Structures are given as structure tokens and as C-alpha cells.
């Protein structure tokens, strides 16, 4: 069964401070998921991250210390995909409307939606404050980054027989060792400047032949645009 890939990067590196200006932290008393700023008033995350009350934290690097660039904005609307399946994690995407627009600057900025889907082999940047250990747990204060390629559909499906839908992509390394993990859920996979994935699920973290599975954002551009227009 899928286990929520919900909190941290294994085998990555500490991102340069504020170098991922579209990365947000979803907070409900503490960090619980990531997200991506797609316009000044909307964030995209994973539907399995849903909570009824969410504070969006932007401009973060060290989530445990006030460093001066943060913006904390409560969610006004939280909209999960109407066809989200909590068992299979199909359609694992959610939109959050901020109660007021974020102030955009060098440390808080939007990421583009995909203009087309990403080909296998495309290198992407995954980021988050999730667990940094594949066994045991260690949650970082500083945002972690990982460069990883989009895997072919065939290797993705052979890693997870019967569990990969057309709305999922695998990104990572079949040899293991580098992956997103618990606490990274909802966060971005950005390839060539476009948001191509949302951290969704996986079997453990950084295990051999069990790469991370991500929501295939290119399938949802119309839904995102229509939902924003209607809300």
C-alpha cells in the first residue's frame, strides 16, 4: 500500500537560503507538508495533506527561527481535487487560496505551471523539510534540495505493479539512496522552471527499486486554471 511520502529529503543537500522562493511550508502548529506558490494568492499541494485549517508560510529557510523574510498567511479556501482517492492516492492535488495575496519579492515568488509534460530523463529539483533518514527520523530546520531525473513510465510501473495511474510520475533513483520522504509531501518537483510534480507517496524512502511517486501536474493545468478562475 502507498505510504505517505510526507516529510523530508534523503540524500540531498541544504538549499541555498531562499533559493527556492516558490516553496511554502504548510503549518498547523508545526510544519506538516510542503506546497508551491503558483500565483500571489494560490498555492498547490497534495490532497493527502488536507487539513481544515492551514497557515501558509512563505519566504522560509529555517522553519524553526524567524529570519525576517517570512510571510505567514492563513488559508481562506482549501480545495482538494474532486476525484482524489485516499486509498490509491490518484489525483493527489489540492489548491489553497490565501486570505490575502502574498507580497512577491526575491524570496517569495511563483513557479510556472507546465507547458507540456516532462520527458523521461529530465532533471528536476525536489525540495522540502521532510525526514532526512531512510530509517529512523531526523527532521531538518533548513530547507533540503535534491536533483533527480524523471523516470520512464515503464520503470515506474514495474517498481509499483498495479499502483501507478496516468496521473502519477516517478522521479528519483532506482538504486535508492536519494528520495523525498515524510514531511516533503505536497512540495514541488520543478523541471526546467516548470512545476511538473507534487510529492505524493512511495514505499519507504530512498529504498532500492522504490522511487518516489509524484502527482503528474501537467494533467491538471486546466483544472487548476478553472478552479482559480471560479474562486
Curated annotation (Swiss-Prot):
Its EC number is 3.4.21.4. Binds 1 Ca(2+) ion per subunit. Pfam families: Trypsin. The record marks 179 as: Required for specificity. Residues 1-8 form a propeptide. Disulfide bonds join 15-145, 33-49, 117-218, 124-191, 156-170, 181-205. GO terms for biological process: digestion; proteolysis. It is found in: Secreted, Extracellular space. Belongs to the peptidase S1 family. This is Trypsin.
Amino acid at each position: 500500500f502507498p505510504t505517505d511520502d510526507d516529510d523530508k529529503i534523503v540524500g540531498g543537500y541544504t538549499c541555498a537560503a531562499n533559493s527556492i522562493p516558490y516553496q511554502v511550508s504548510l503549518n498547523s502548529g508545526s510544519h506538516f507538508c510542503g506546497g508551491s506558490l503558483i500565483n500571489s494568492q494560490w498555492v498547490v499541494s497534495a490532497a493527502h495533506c488536507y487539513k481544515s485549517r492551514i497557515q501558509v508560510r512563505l519566504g522560509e529557510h529555517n522553519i524553526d527561527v524567524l529570519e525576517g523574510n517570512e510571510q505567514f498567511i492563513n488559508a481562506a479556501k482549501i480545495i482538494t481535487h474532486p476525484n482524489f482517492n485516499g486509498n490509491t492516492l490518484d489525483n493527489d492535488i489540492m489548491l489553497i487560496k490565501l486570505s490575502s495575496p502574498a507580497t512577491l519579492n526575491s524570496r517569495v515568488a511563483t513557479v510556472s505551471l507546465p507547458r507540456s509534460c516532462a520527458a523521461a530523463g529530465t532533471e528536476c529539483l525536489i525540495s522540502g523539510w521532510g525526514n532526512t533518514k531512510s530509517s529512523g527520523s531526523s527532521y531538518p530546520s533548513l530547507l533540503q534540495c535534491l536533483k533527480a531525473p524523471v523516470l520512464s513510465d515503464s520503470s515506474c510501473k514495474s517498481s509499483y505493479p498495479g499502483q501507478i495511474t496516468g496521473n502519477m510520475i516517478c522521479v528519483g533513483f532506482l538504486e535508492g539512496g536519494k528520495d523525498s520522504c515524510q514531511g516533503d509531501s505536497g512540495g514541488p518537483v520543478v523541471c526546467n522552471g516548470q512545476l511538473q510534480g507534487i510529492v505524493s507517496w512511495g514505499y519507504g524512502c530512498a529504498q532500492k527499486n522504490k522511487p518516489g511517486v509524484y502527482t503528474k501536474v501537467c494533467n491538471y493545468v486546466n483544472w487548476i486554471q478553472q478552479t482559480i478562475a471560479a474562486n
